[in-house]
Amino acid sequence: RATPVDVSALYILLDKMHRETVMSVAPINPEKLIGAINTAIHRGVVLLAEVKNKIVGSIGGLASSEWWSDQMHLSDMWFYVLPDSRNSSAAIKLVKSFIKIGNEANMKIKLGHVYSGDFERKDKFFGRLGLVKAGSLYTEVN
């Protein structure tokens, strides 16, 4: 699990994720991103994949509920693995660990992928882990 010591490295990782988007997205507000990372570390779940003491991937999220229910679920804020580590087991280990933490807390998992492209491959990846696709997201593009 990530600790406050990891905030700077996570910022750099998530900035790389942001730069890989296939659609136009809003620019990063550094203070807001640092605040979100800290919130996830202190009140949620932030897991790291490391190779030789270097972070190569992360998944982070919070417990929340749907607007119509009190039932809690564990939802990701981000899930990203560096391109050079995508053929490793980093992604599957991160997601399986995230699911396990949610299950141990009696929460269902909600994961998404938006803006990053390669949608079919990612849908299949999540499907192999027992997750079911639940819709789509539509947005205006500038």
Where are these regions (language model features)?
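A short beta-loop-alpha structural element at the N-terminal edge
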Residues: 1-12
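A conserved beta-turn-beta hairpin within the catalytic core of GNAT-like acetyltransferases
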Residues: 65-76, 134
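A short helix-loop-beta-strand connector motif used in the catalytic cores of GNAT acetyltransferases and
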Residues: 36-48
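Conserved GNAT-fold acetyl-CoA-binding loop/helix
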Residues: 15-36
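Conserved beta-strand-loop-alpha-helix junction that forms the acyl-donor binding cleft
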Residues: 110-121, 141-142
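Conserved beta-strand in the GNAT
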Residues: 48, 54-64
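Conserved acetyl-CoA-binding loop-helix of GNAT-fold acetyltransferases
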Residues: 87-100
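A short, internal acetyl-CoA/4′-phosphopantetheine-binding micro-motif in the GNAT/acyltransferase core
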Residues: 77-88
